[in-house]
UniProtKB/Swiss-Prot annotation:
It comes from Neorhizobium galegae. It is found in: Periplasm. This is Copper-containing nitrite reductase. Predicted to be exported by the Tat system. The position of the signal peptide cleavage has not been experimentally proven. The type I copper site in NIR plays a crucial role for electron transfer from pseudoazurin to the type II copper site of NIR, which comprises the catalytic center of NIR for the reduction of nitrite. InterPro entries: Cu-oxidase-like_N, Cu-oxidase_2nd, Cupredoxin, NO2-reductase_Cu, TAT_signal. Belongs to the multicopper oxidase family. Residues 33-214, 215-379 form the Plastocyanin-like domain. The lineage of its organism: Bacteria, Pseudomonadati, Pseudomonadota, Alphaproteobacteria, Hyphomicrobiales. One of its GO terms (cellular component) is periplasmic space. Binds 1 Cu(2+) ion. The Cu(2+) ion is held by residues from each of 2 monomers of the trimer. Nitrite is bound to the Cu(2+) ion site. Pseudoazurin is the physiological electron donor for the Cu-NIR in vitro.
Length: 379
């Protein structure tokens, strides 16, 4: 490997090697912090000090932490903690490896749930065992690069960010260090937050929508370099992999497009569970590429394709479009038992690259909805 791309811990923290290879797309942290921002921190602190605080234990996707669908009482300060983990993961049944960058060890990172006008207070920990600098950009937040300018953490650092959740919807969050944003995001460092309206979800007529289950599907594109024989390469570290990964990324052609970190992660024993009659809210994020979720054998009864609950949901959707850098929500009442494939309906990405999962639904079959009038016969 050439000296130009030999990423030591020191050079990665300084950003020199990476910035030389990637023209920074995001304004530098120094510029963001030096913009002459004035704050009313004393008044804000006094107001927030009177609010109830709630500490939430995050859980790994596809599950979400316990929450109420309607806000109870006045806005709260909702406390979360995430620890950044740089870890090697296997993304398919062939043993293909990725040096992933993760929030709390999972791809995607955990789903956070609050109510509109709550304050999100995140403690972000970058252990000294990590090699890279990180931060977090919340698409749900206002100002300072979505919090990215205020959360730059080197190995061994901890930052605490607080922001007011003023917009209702499902929003992406992701790592966004200057000069390295695409690398971190396509290495798995993204997740989503759901900000519920204080009075809960509503249909297009303003009637309440209550869900029985909620699942979080995080779609991830990986770019794994190949050798001259077309086999996926393996590396000792993220820094060693970086120059080859960068070239693979620049093709804009992922080698894997997966749900929840790996091919088949939401199938078989890990299929999402429901019963006939269950009202299920499916949250789906894609931090980098467009996607087209489709439930084979089902529908989106109510769909917020770009995830924003101030807008009325679309009705009876077969497939919905979520642009890259967004998260969507679909609400469906299951009416038949069986295995439902939930896919990105770019079918090449679903069947060849891995963007597929399963719902396993139990209950009684309804012949009125579907029946085999004549079963297939030969001759």
């Amino acid at each position: 490997m050439s000296e130009q791309f030999r990423l030591t811990r020191r050079s990665m923290l300084a950003g020199a090697a990476v910035a030389g290879a990637l023209a920074p797309v995001v304004t530098s942290v120094a510029h963001a912090e030096g913009g002459g921002i004035k704050t009313n921190s004393a008044a804000t602190a006094a107001n927030i000090a009177t609010l109830e605080r709630v500490k939430v234990e995050l859980v790994k996707p596809p599950f979400v932490h316990a929450h109420t669908q309607k806000a109870e009482g006045e806005p709260k300060v909702v406390e979360f903690k995430m620890t950044i983990q740089e870890k090697k993961i296997v993304v398919d049944d062939k043993g293909t490896e990725v040096h992933a960058m993760t929030f709390d060890g999972s791809v995607p990172g955990p789903m956070m749930i609050v109510h509109q006008d709550d304050y999100v207070e995140l403690t972000l920990v970058n252990p000294d065992t990590n090699e890279l600098q990180h931060n977090i950009d919340f698409h749900s937040a206002t100002g300072a690069l979505g919090g990215g300018a205020l959360t730059v953490v080197n190995p061994g650092d901890t930052a605490v960010l607080r922001f007011k959740a003023t917009k209702a919807g499902v929003f992406v969050y992701h790592c966004a260090p200057a000069g390295m944003v695409p690398w971190h995001v396509t290495s798995g460092m993204n997740g989503a937050i759901m900000v519920l309206p204080r009075d809960g979800l509503k249909d297009h007529k303003g009637h309440e929508l209550v869900y029985d289950k909620v699942y979080y599907v995080g779609e991830q594109d990986f770019y794994v370099p190949k050798d001259e024989n077309g086999k996926f390469k393996k590396y000792e570290s993220a820094g060693e992999a970086y120059p080859d990964v960068l070239e693979a990324m620049k093709t804009l052609t992922p080698t894997h497009v997966v749900f929840n970190g790996a091919v088949g992660a939401l199938t078989g024993d890990n299929a999402l569970q429901a019963k006939v009659g269950d009202r299920v809210l499916i949250l789906h994020s894609q931090a980098n590429r467009d996607t087209r979720p489709h439930l084979i054998g089902g529908h989106g009864d109510y769909v917020w394709a770009t995830g924003k609950f101030a807008n009325p949901p679309e009705l009876d959707q077969e497939t919905w479009f979520i642009p890259g850098g967004a998260a969507g929500a679909a609400y469906y009442t299951f009416q038949q038992p069986g295995i439902y494939a939930y896919v990105n309906h770019n079918l090449i990405e679903a069947f060849e690259l891995g963007a597929a999962g399963h719902f396993k639904v139990t209950g009684d079959w309804n012949d009125d909805l579907m029946t085999a009038v004549v079963s297939p016969t030969s001759g």
